[in-house]
Design a protein with these regions (language model features):
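...captures the hydrophobic TM-helix bundle architecture rather than a specific catalytic motif
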Residues: 1-224
């Protein structure tokens, strides 16, 4: 079963890598491939769309390459365990899927779904040995700290929608020049809207990458 997991990841990486290299190499235009409706609430609607362009292709290749190495190492590491590790590899595959969803997203809502999927998979992997109190405590700490940071992240996405009336990358990026001088007043001080948005998104990234003040979960996560 472990060998099949590693082999499956190798085949997936090679197939997707070949397809993406062809996509990039032939210089095809940026485009999204809609797969399914993701959210439809009132007048708000967004689809699950895979977007391919130079940056996303690079990130997909990076995610698959690192994930392949992690899967290969995990196959060797978990082979010494007496109990089957099906649950572990399911969590690891979920992490890879969420990361791919994140880097291939076409809008901020899909990015957020992938973002939260990565957080969920991290929580499950850190707490895999649920019979160990240290691992369980580390998983809870990671989950709580990341949710605090994610609150800033989702508020940033909400503010983007309020300002630009869209979460689509193309629409938002095209409208940025017109919003450069837009300001909100906070405590009597005018602050540029884009600065607020960037700050909120940055705090969200700080939590996920365990940067200053939002890093305590990372050392504890090693217990998992």
């Amino acid at each position: 079963a472990y060998a099949a997991t590693g082999l499956g990841m190798c085949v997936t990486t090679l197939c997707v890598g070949n397809a993406l290299c062809g996509e990039w190499g032939y210089g095809l235009p940026q485009r999204g491939e809609p797969l399914a409706e993701l959210v439809h609430a009132g007048g708000f609607e967004t689809t699950w769309t895979l977007r391919f362009f130079a940056l996303s292709v690079t990130m997909v290749a990076m995610v698959l390459s690192v994930s392949l190495l992690v899967h290969v190492y995990s196959v060797w590491y978990m082979s010494h365990e007496t109990m089957p590790a099906y649950r572990f590899f399911a969590y690891l595959s979920l992490f890879t899927f969420a990361m791919l969803m994140l880097v291939s997203s076409n809008d901020l809502v899909q990015l957020f779904f992938g973002w939260e999927g990565v957080g969920l998979a991290s929580y499950l992997l850190i707490g895999y040995w649920y019979d160990r109190p240290a691992a369980t405590a580390a998983a809870i700490k990671a989950f709580v700290v990341n949710r605090v940071a994610d609150l800033f992240f989702i508020v940033g996405i909400g503010l983007i929608y309020v300002v630009f009336h869209s979460v689509q990358y193309d629409v938002v990026f095209a409208a940025v020049p017109q919003a450069l001088m837009a300001t909100y007043t906070l405590c009597g001080v005018p602050v540029r809207v884009l600065e607020i948005i960037c700050f909120l998104l940055f705090v969200g990234a700080m939590g996920k990458s365990a940067q200053l003040f939002l890093h305590p979960w990372l050392p504890a996560a090693l217990a998992g």
